[in-house]
Design a protein with these regions (language model features):
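Acidic, serine/threonine-rich low-complexity disordered tracts
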Residues: 1-97, 137-224
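Hydrophobic, well-structured mid-protein blocks that either form specific transmembrane helices
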Residues: 89-132
Length: 224
């Protein structure tokens, strides 16, 4: 059969290229900045996330990207890359999904991982895009098979919780709050998407053991 990554993509309504900037907060104090972008990449898209954090003597800089096509309302990722530098060891994670050969390759050396192929796979970044498409289709509960950075399958579960107004560095926006569930009571993950900004991620908040880990808030947005 033909490789969908090579043959084309569907154009999704509301799935539009953008550039966005964020402030990374913890306990109300700014500790860094981040940016996200979506751009056309040949027949598909590239979704990227960059962040730079400084907290006391700790420094962390990350660059993350996912390339994918959209077919019949589903994202099909072909390549995922995450690079981390700063305090401690540098990291490089890479995944390649060959839909024609049904092979998953990992690491810089692109070693074939011996794991049963799954047509539902998403990576750590592309599943964000799938949430956007699913919300646009009216879905309120989402279950995804997500490959972690080592190419191991994980189940991610999210649900729509409510719609509410947020006051952000960007300004005041009305957003849909979605919550992750099923990962244990000690970890909470909330994300807010703004319909008026093409369902852009405008805030991301995480807590573990009742301690806030980060609060990423939109500061600037530009549609492409």
């Amino acid at each position: 059969p033909a490789d969908p990554v090579a043959t084309g993509t569907d154009s999704a309504v509301g799935f539009k290229p953008f550039e966005a900037s964020y402030q990374i907060l913890r306990s109300g104090k700014k500790h860094g900045e981040a940016s996200r972008y979506l751009k056309r990449d040949g027949v598909g898209y590239e979704l990227g996330y960059n962040s730079k954090i400084s907290w006391l003597v700790f420094k962390d800089e990350r660059k993350e990207r996912s390339r994918f096509v959209i077919e019949q309302g589903r994202l099909k990722p072909s390549h995922y890359l995450m690079q981390r530098s700063g305090t401690g060891p540098s990291r490089h994670y890479e995944l390649s999904l060959d839909w024609a050969q049904k092979q998953l390759k990992t690491e810089k050396k692109q070693v074939v991982k011996q794991i049963p192929w799954n047509d539902q796979w998403l990576d750590m970044l592309s599943f964000h895009g799938q949430i956007v498409l699913d919300i646009q289709q009216g879905k309120t509960d989402f279950v995804y098979d997500v490959l972690n950075r080592h190419g191991e399958n994980r189940t991610y579960k999210y649900k729509v919780a409510t719609e509410e107004w947020l006051s952000l560095p960007y300004g005041k926006v009305k957003a849909i709050r979605i919550e992750r569930y099923g990962q244990g009571p000690d970890k909470q993950v909330y994300a807010w998407l703004a319909p008026e900004l093409d369902f852009l991620l405008v805030r991301l908040w995480q807590s573990e053991d009742d301690v806030e880990q980060f609060d990423v808030q939109l500061s600037a947005y530009k549609a492409q």
